[in-house]
């Protein structure tokens, strides 16, 4: 294969990798944890990844402890966990 063909193949593979959504095997384990408000009761609107619905949903975070499946924005949740 010529060097031009190899460069084209490399470019296509790179583009495919960038455009491929996060798969469950690439998703961090904490994305499978349930939403957990924690013991505090401040009440911050937050987002968690729901693996059954395969999307990020809003919940109220108490402000301390809880699980790592807790994001300030829906966009952050989706870029980390959503397929």
Curated annotation (Swiss-Prot):
It is found in: Secreted. InterPro entries: Kunitz_BPTI, Kunitz_BPTI_sf, Prtase_inh_Kunz-CS, TFPI/VKTCI-like. The record marks 41-42 as: Reactive bond for trypsin. GO terms for molecular function: serine-type endopeptidase inhibitor activity. CDD domains: Kunitz_textilinin-like (cd22594). Expressed by the venom gland. It holds the Pfam family Kunitz_BPTI. The keyword Protein biosynthesis does not apply. Residues 31-81 form the BPTI/Kunitz inhibitor domain. Disulfide bonds join 31-81, 40-64, 56-77. PROSITE patterns: BPTI_KUNITZ_1, BPTI_KUNITZ_2. Keywords: Disulfide bond, Protease inhibitor, Secreted, Serine protease inhibitor, Signal. GO terms for cellular component: extracellular space. Residues 1-24 form the signal peptide. Belongs to the venom Kunitz-type family. Serine protease inhibitor. This is Kunitz-type serine protease inhibitor scutellin-1.
